[in-house]
Amino acid sequence: MAFRISPLWWPVMTAASPVLVPMLLRKNGRFKKNLTRANELNQERIERAEPLELPKLDFLELTVLVEEKTQEGFLGDAGVSYLFRTDQGSLLYDVGFGPTRPAMAHNAAKLGFTLDQVDALAISHLHCDHMGGIPAQRSKQVTVPEEMGLPGGKTCFLPDEAKAEGFTTELVKGPRLLTAGIASTGPLARSLFILGWTEEQALLARVRDKGVVVFTGCGHPTIEIILKMVRRLSNEPLYAIGGGLHFPVTYGRGNRAGIQFQMLIGTGLPPWRQISDDELSSTIASINEAAPKHVYLSAHDTCDHSLKRFENEVNAETQVLRAGAKYHL
């Protein structure tokens, strides 16, 4: 059994309990209020969403710049950066831990990728593993490794208020087309106990003779809510789902000092509750009900136990995304 917090920390926590317990109780009150608020807001957003005129793309190609799992010669990290290319242009989705860890710059260089090869950047949500590192999250400023070149004023599509040096920032307030024939669901909310109110946008695109492809960053709003929005935006068949779903059931990625951070701070549960196989089973059932033909799993926020269950139990061709790999969607 993996402890979410190493027993070495337990004496410290016991000593700190007179301060820690009241703080957790206050946070729990805010967390519960925000749970209700997020559910109501998402429902309102879905109900008022209008169908999007998604262009029929002749092709949609994904190159994975940052992921936990890798092709040989690439660096893995518990973050995400996906490059989408279409017959109408290209869009970079997230920048992993940016310049604070080596994976983004190393993998981009190995792939020969620089920012002048994309039309725009979209950030799924304002967490460190997607917007460029812990300093980026604290300052709410998207940060990209300088080795990847200058942004040159290109658009950075954001789901919430933030800055992005060198980019022209554009706040996405609802479902809309972005660039390269790729659209955003608009921000969808989730209350997280430690990280607080989180807005996340997923991407969707329509591929000719196939259907709609949906990609998430972490999937914090849950894939069920994201797919409800997608159904409002398009009546085309669902062809593929990809990206993070956040299921660290048995352990988390990127653990530090004996603390399983992903199991504590990103699950949408209070820290004394652990995300379970029952919740994983519910999500697997929801994906099977949606009936995509392909599922592309992110390992950056999902443990190997959960990945294996997805691969074995989802009724679709399922594979785990790897940094350095290309996928023709």
Regions found by a protein language model. Name each.
Residues 102-154, 233-246:
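Active-site metal-binding motif and surrounding structural segment of the metallo-beta-lactamase
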Residues 144-203, 319-324:
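Metallo-beta-lactamase
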Residues 2-4, 120, 127, 211-213, ...:
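Cap/insert and terminal regions of metallo-dependent hydrolase folds
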Residues 2-88, 175-192:
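Zn-dependent metallo-beta-lactamase
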Residues 181-186, 203-223:
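Internal active-site segments that recognize and position negatively charged phosphoryl groups
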Residues 100-104, 131, 164-165, 222-225, ...:
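Short, well-ordered alpha-helical microsegments
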Residues 67-69, 95-98, 126, 188-189, ...:
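Active-site metal-binding loops of divalent metal-dependent hydrolases
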Residues 55, 59-111, 196, 200-215:
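Conserved beta-strand hairpin/beta-sheet module of binuclear metal-dependent hydrolase folds
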